[in-house]
């Protein structure tokens, strides 16, 4: 890798969760490959050898999910005894907030905000009410500030629960 011979090509495939050494990264050209939604579903179905929608309510899957995120969601549901096929997205969010799983589970630590955004976006598109658009905008801003200033996530999620899920 340091001084490869002529016509030598290395392909390094990497899971984004694990970082390569900076010395290796500096010698690489990065290609970020992104699957479209249909390919994500197709790839997930191939990995599972089954149809993903037999196990998950479509409201819980986003067009931005990866096959790994969908499979991790299935694993998360098995660990926490959640029936993803029958649970609605608002029931799912309430369950996560009540059990504080956004603090306890690595998958939820990194993906919970996307479920919150998806639910708010669903409210905005379904109802066409300005109230939800303002809440969506407010949540995005508060979420960014929470991350930027390392603020308490619990107050953010309780505020979300009170204003959106119970409001």
Predicted regions and their residues:
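AAA+ P-loop NTPase domains with strong preference for DNA replication initiators
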Residues: 42-167
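Short, surface-exposed, polar/charged, turn-prone segments marking secondary-structure boundaries
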Residues: 8, 38-42
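Short acidic/polar capping segments at secondary-structure boundaries
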Residues: 15-18, 35
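Secondary-structure boundary/capping positions in well-ordered alpha/beta enzyme cores
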Residues: 7-8, 31, 51
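Conserved catalytic/switch belt of AAA+ P-loop NTPases
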Residues: 1-12, 19-22
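Amphipathic alpha-helical recognition patches that constitute DNA-binding helices
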Residues: 19, 32, 111
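A short helix-turn-beta junction within AAA+ P-loop NTPase domains corresponding to the substrate/partner-engaging
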Residues: 22-38
């Amino acid at each position: 890798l340091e001084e490869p011979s002529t016509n030598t090509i290395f392909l390094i495939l990497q899971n984004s969760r694990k970082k390569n050494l900076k010395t290796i990264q500096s010698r690489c050209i990065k290609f970020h490959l992104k699957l479209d939604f249909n390919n994500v579903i197709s790839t997930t179905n191939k990995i599972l050898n089954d149809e993903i929608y037999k196990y998950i309510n479509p409201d819980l899957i986003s067009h931005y999910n990866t096959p790994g995120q969908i499979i991790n969601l299935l694993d998360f549901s098995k660990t926490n005894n959640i029936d993803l096929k029958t649970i609605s997205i608002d029931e799912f969010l309430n369950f996560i907030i009540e059990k504080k799983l956004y603090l306890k589970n690595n998958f939820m630590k990194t993906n919970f905000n996307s479920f919150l955004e998806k639910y708010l976006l669903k409210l905005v598109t379904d109802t066409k009410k300005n109230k939800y658009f303002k809440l969506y905008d407010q949540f995005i801003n508060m979420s960014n500030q929470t991350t930027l200033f390392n603020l308490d996530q619990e107050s953010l999620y309780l505020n979300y629960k009170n204003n959106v899920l119970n409001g």
